[in-house]
Amino acid sequence: MGRFFSMDNKFFTFMNKVADLCILNIICLVCCIPIVTAGASITAMYYVTLKMVRNEEAYIVRSFFKSFKDNFKQATIINLIMIAVGAVLYLDLNVAKNMPGSAGQIFHVIFMAFVIIYYVLFLYVYPILARFYNTIRNTIKNALFMAIRHLPYTVVMVLIGLCPLLLLFICSYQIQSTLFVLFLVMGFGVIAYCNSFFLVKIFDLYMPKEENEEQKSEGTEV
């Protein structure tokens, strides 16, 4: 009985992880409400989940706001760039949709390809910012480089990120609503945590062996 209630019990370890992801998810969502701070919030979330995967996490809230503060400037600039590019892509898709004939279809395919690139960049750029010191230009360039070089991992992370869309195919409104609420409570944190298993494997390839585990690596261009 004592062993069952031990904090080292796998069940309690799992539940602690779930609780941490719920807390992390809610903090991230709250800090994303002023859209301009979303970049810093997502970066901070990945800072924590990357540590969780390495079993280095201590205080979720403290670690989150440490990264939020340290990376705020760069993350905000990158976020504004991503918002601007996303807005342009949205307008381009609408223009292509309203174009008559085959020209509209061709442009629609072209712009959808750019949307995929945009989404892949989104998957990598904030985790890279959370893990490496670098310039904004090199952070974006390295995000594209890693996404292409580690394409199998990229495909898996894309599929993980698209999993919430499965909610649209659930016929029962009650089940759909329940899962949607559950996703709002911990969904983004779970996605970041799952992606972090792959990101840790990727990032380890670019980390100096002698680097202290508590610090980011100095931003060598990969």
Protein language model regions, located:
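Helix-coil boundary and N-terminal low-complexity module in membrane systems
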Residues: 1-111, 118-222
